[in-house]
Regions:
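C-terminal beta-strand-loop-alpha-helix "lid" module of Rossmann-like NAD(P)-dependent dehydrogenases
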Residues: 1-247
């Protein structure tokens, strides 16, 4: 039977553990609020870019552009698809990392002609340990998502898409629905899905106004799409970070 001193030591140990756990929770909560605030502050700009693309496609539904070209001449089995997988940096988030990796493996089995890109140490180490080639690891901590890092990621993938090294670009991340639930999301970034910018997704009070695109529709699209892709990746990084903190 434990003596009084041993019991006191165990009580102190439990109390110390509780203090550490509470401190970790407070830190995670603070980081989560900070990241959500950062996303909310940048959303208006990226929504504006998205609306520019919507307006262009609404006025010119038959517009042709490399970012809209689905490359139908390339057979499905010959298409090279790039996948950005966003995981955590640590394995302490339980099902959070497991669900992402499980979904990534399923996708890669269905798309054998793929190129893998990782953000987050957990995913990178897992795929490497399983002998799965990683095309590029973006050495950015998931703990600090920034627009600059999102822009570097989008620039790399868009460059490979433009040089036809990739026929499609996808991203896999976790989206926080609310503080109690989250879900794994897979989205194709390139080529753009026109239905994401369809007129019926716009508020009904937006008029079908005439407008002029200078210097040309192609130039406007050249500017708008990279900004849109960067905004989507940044949002995915922030959502993934919030999910990890909340897991």
């Amino acid at each position: 039977m434990a003596n009084a001193r041993e019991i006191l030591n165990r009580m102190r140990s439990v109390q110390d553990t509780q203090k550490i756990t509470n401190a970790m929770y407070l830190i995670s909560s603070t980081k989560l609020k900070k990241s959500k605030k950062m996303l909310e502050e940048t959303e208006p700009y990226f929504y504006t870019i998205q609306n520019i693309i919507r307006r262009m496609l609404r006025h010119m539904p038959e517009m042709e552009h490399p970012y809209l070209n689905s490359r139908e001449e390339v057979k499905d089995e010959d298409r090279t698809r790039g996948l950005i997988v966003v995981t955590g940096d640590k394995g302490m988030a339980g099902a959070y990392n497991h669900n992402i990796i499980k979904e990534a493996q399923k996708w890669m089995e269905e798309n054998p002609n793929h190129r893998l890109y990782t953000v987050g140490e957990v995913g990178h180490h897992y795929f490497v340990s399983k002998g799965m080639p990683v095309e590029e690891q973006f050495h950015y901590t998931v703990q600090n998502p920034t627009q600059h890092r999102a822009r570097l990621i989008s620039s790399t993938l868009m460059d490979e898409y433009e040089r036809r090294q990739l026929d499609e670009v996808w991203i896999l991340y976790t989206y926080m629905i609310n503080s109690m639930s989250m879900e794994v999301r897979m989205e194709r970034l390139l080529p753009l899905r026109k239905e994401r910018f369809s007129a019926n997704q716009l508020p009904s009070d937006i008029p079908m106004e005439d407008f002029e695109m200078l210097p040309s529709p192609q130039a406007v699209m050249d500017m708008a799409v990279p900004e849109y892709i960067t905004g989507y990746i940044f949002g995915a990084l922030v959502e993934a970070f919030c999910c990890e903190q909340n897991a």
